[in-house]
């Protein structure tokens, strides 16, 4: 989905839509939206939602994998506005050092990985691309603060040790998951994707948009 603001350059929506048949992490709460009041009967349409905070495009707070980590409302918002490098690594099983060692990362604080060509908005695919913990440490050493992926997690679906998540915690990097990068090519972009101020929250859905930089 593309957004155009006046005469400015085109913004691209990289957010997974939230709907009742969307792919959900196994065991998580399915997304549901319902009208609890209607215009006809109550004077206005008023809806409520039920969902996991990790449904769709979202930011993980450190509290997600650390009882003493920051909650989502305590994250520095400036990290989720600014330039981002988008890298294409399509059909890679795991992002490893050979995939990132030669990247030009001077001044790069945000990096997103596009790992697939087909985006299924209805079926959960457990064969997604993960990130090796060594890559996390490498990116942190280069000054990266935020890492995004079009996968639903940086660890495999059957990995209960969450090694990549804990590498992010140790390196003080932040994770954005389930990006919808179908209409985006590799390059430098402006990025906006702010979390909700959910007090004590372990994650938050975001509306993520990018536009190409010169």
Predicted regions located by residue number:
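Active-/binding-site microenvironments in catalytic and ligand-binding cores
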Residues: 3-214
